[in-house]
């Protein structure tokens, strides 16, 4: 990462010419899933601060809110700010009130849905073209070739620049890439989530596909450890994840303590160490830690010494 007071370095994401900051900003927690939505003026200020600090990749999805996170970014990117960023959003997960009440979600990847979702995101973001458009989850009922075929048409129509996949298998990535170049695959990758290293990471690298690592701080646990749970509201879905349950918490607490010990030796914070590990995986990897606080963003952008 860049030293304090300098701009964030750039990396090539994929093989189609997309260039982004070596670290992006995940915007989900500003509007959804990690407790109640945060005050809009504060989040717009945070987004502007990130951009002014050199971050160019902003990540959202139509399911965050749902919809309100895209609307927030649309407001934040007024007044010439849009031209300074690469805006990534996603489609495919439907989480209406009735689904939310049942703790369920639907996944859609049929052509009509893809097109309608794209048009709706363009409207909410108040833009003419989405820079990077991911299929958020793969619809197993629809061949990936059909979904990507529709995305390809949207690229040809100028509504999308680049196509991505999120949480896709290695075989699905190959099949999709054969229809239209996939620029990036988004996946969970961190010190405590490494299952993607066996097949998916090698496949992306073989095909020249960029890697966007979400939850590089272990959904906040690698920053705060067990105390993260103390202030969680009932609206915070992390409260119900297996890794945060009592039967797993002791092992994860031990992992966090080891990270803290290493961070002390390095002269950095646990979150800086965790991010340094992700950056060290290669210059084709862009982590997108999320935050709702400017002080956390500043900390996340400082390098871990000797990282």
Swiss-Prot record:
Regions that span the bilayer: none
Positions bearing the site annotation: Lowers pKa of active site Tyr: 90
Native source organism of the sequence: Nicotiana tabacum
Factors inducing expression: By auxin.
Similarity comment: family membership: Belongs to the aldo/keto reductase family. Aldo/keto reductase 2 subfamily.
SUPFAM superfamilies, per database record: NAD(P)-linked oxidoreductase
Keyword Transport: no
Lineage: Eukaryota, Viridiplantae, Streptophyta, Embryophyta, Tracheophyta
Name the UniProt record assigns to this protein: Auxin-induced protein PCNT115
Pfam families: Aldo_ket_red
Top-rank taxon, per record: Eukaryota
């Amino acid at each position: 990462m860049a030293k304090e007071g300098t701009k964030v370095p750039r990396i090539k994401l994929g093989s189609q010419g997309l260039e982004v900051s070596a670290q992006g900003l995940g915007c989900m927690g500003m509007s959804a899933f990690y407790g109640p939505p945060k005050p809009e003026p504060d989040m717009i200020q945070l987004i502007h601060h990130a951009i002014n600090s050199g971050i160019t990749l902003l990540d959202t999805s139509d399911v965050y809110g749902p919809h309100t996170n895209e609307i927030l970014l649309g407001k934040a990117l007024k007044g010439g700010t849009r031209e300074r960023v690469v805006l990534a959003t996603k489609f495919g997960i439907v989480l209406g009130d009735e689904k939310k009440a049942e703790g369920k979600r639907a996944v859609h990847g049929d052509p009509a849905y893809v097109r309608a979702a794209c048009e709706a995101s363009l409207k909410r973001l108040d833009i003419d073209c989405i820079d990077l458009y991911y299929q958020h989850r793969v619809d197993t009922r629809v061949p990936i070739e059909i979904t990507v075929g529709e995305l390809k048409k949207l690229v040809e129509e100028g509504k999308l620049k680049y196509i991505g996949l999120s949480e896709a298998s290695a075989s699905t990535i190959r099949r999709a890439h054969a229809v239209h170049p996939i620029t990036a695959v988004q996946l969970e990758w961190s010190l405590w989530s490494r299952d993607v290293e066996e097949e998916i990471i090698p496949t992306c690298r073989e095909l020249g596909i960029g890697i966007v690592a979400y939850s590089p701080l272990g959904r906040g646990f690698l920053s705060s450890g067990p105390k993260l749970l103390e202030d969680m509201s009932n609206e915070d879905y992390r409260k119900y994840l297996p890794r945060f349950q009592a039967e797993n918490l002791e092992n994860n607490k031990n992992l966090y303590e080891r990270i803290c010990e290493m961070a002390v030796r390095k002269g950095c914070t646990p979150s800086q160490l965790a991010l340094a590990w992700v950056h060290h995986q290669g210059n084709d990897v862009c982590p997108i830690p999320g935050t709702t606080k400017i002080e956390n963003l500043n900390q996340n952008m400082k390098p871990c010494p000797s990282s």
